Amino acid sequence: MSLSNKLPVTDVDLKGKRVLIRVDFNVPLDENENVTNPQRIVGALPTIKYAIDNGRKAVVLMSHLGRPDGKVNPKYSLKPVVPVLEELLGKSVTFTEDCIGPQTEETVNKASDGQVILLENLRFHAEEEGSSKDAEGKKVKADKADVDRSASLTALGDVYVNDAFGTAQRAHSSMVGVDLPQKAAGFLVKKELEYFAKALESPARPFLAILGGAKVSDKIPVIDNLLPKVNSLIIIGGMALTFKKTLENVKIGNSLFDEAGSKILGEIVEKAKKHNVEIVLPVDYVTADKFSADATVGSATTQRIPDGYMGSDVGPESVKLYQKTIAEAKTILWNGPPGVFELKPSPRPTEATLDAAVKAAESGSIVIIGGGDTATVAAKYKAEDKISHVSTGGGASLELLEGKELPGVAALSSK
């Protein structure tokens, strides 16, 4: 699956057409059903506004919210999104009580002059995810006839646009089942694909990957996919301690040791040697007796973390090593924070490593943060606008790094 050859919405003639856009409005709501963080709605605005300005018939928005398990549940209605969307767009938004059916089709077909229509939660129907849950919480497959009703979504548009990268790894009806001649990438998806293509298909070199996480075994598919592509690999987070204990016989105190992951480190090292990849590991640590804001903290060299303590972050010498490696790279792909950045005693190493990535971006390097916890770090230290790209899709970006095909991307038309 090529990431760089997907049809962008800017290459599609939208004039006089019903533009059906899969957005990600899975936003948090408070107890009064008010949207508490509109970031995902804001992220979709460029595509929505483009469709309004260039289509002039109807802009039909569809999304999921929460996990209603294939049944109608007012708690997960998208209706609270309407006032937020209206304020952001500066125009009225029509809400439909269902996402499919004759009444919804009539509303869409009567629309004109760039009218914006928001459909009710896609996941109120079992056919969206292909299953629902019964009263006992057991999964029940959707009826074949119901799954085929993805044609009902197709009836709502003339052109399909996907701008929900965070759901691109899921082969759901709204992601892969809409059968229209042109299926384009919205601006948000287009940006995601462009940046991941820069790293995974045609990176400027040296190409550095920074990978973190608690367990090596969780990142084996990512490491395996990236080793033939990168020039250097910084291992951070808890899994670095499994590397240190296994490869260098370092005492790691009470730190988590990934027994299963340790058994394949030999293969990883051999593969790195085969592809001439430098693996960079920490050389000192910040330690803590517990993962809590009132933890007793200390420091440790590369040789030994004392019993009763865990490695909670890297030390100053490790940061210097990371900074040097980051400064030398022209493409940097980062997934996973260096340490337990939530702890008050040890934010600085994480922040210092992020600062190095920001400086690299400012000097012209491509720096991509792969969603999830790493994106949270970027937001915490207000670095989102200083990095080349912070991915909006934790699960989707992880699957791209693993070399997997994303169903929602594969379903898009080629240029």
Swiss-Prot record:
Record: residues binding ATP: A214, K219, G238, G311, E342, D373, T374
Annotated keywords: ATP-binding, Cytoplasm, Glycolysis, Kinase, Magnesium, Metal-binding, Mitochondrion, Nucleotide-binding, Transferase
Family matches, as Pfam families: PGK
UniProt xrefs under SUPFAM superfamilies: Phosphoglycerate kinase
Cofactor(s) listed in the protein's UniProt record: Mg(2+)
CDD domains, sorted: Phosphoglycerate_kinase
EC supergroup of this enzyme: transferase
Keyword Coiled coil among record annotations: no
Top-level taxonomic group: Eukaryota
Protein function: Catalyzes one of the two ATP producing reactions in the glycolytic pathway via the reversible conversion of 1,3-diphosphoglycerate to 3-phosphoglycerate. Both L- and D- forms of purine and pyrimidine nucleotides can be used as substrates, but the activity is much lower on pyrimidines. Negatively regulates the biosynthesis of acetyl-CoA from pyruvate in the mitochondrion.
Subunit structure: Monomer.
Name listed for the protein in its UniProt record: Phosphoglycerate kinase
Organism in which the protein naturally occurs: Penicillium chrysogenum
Lineage, opening ranks: Eukaryota, Fungi, Dikarya, Ascomycota, Pezizomycotina
Gene field: PGKA
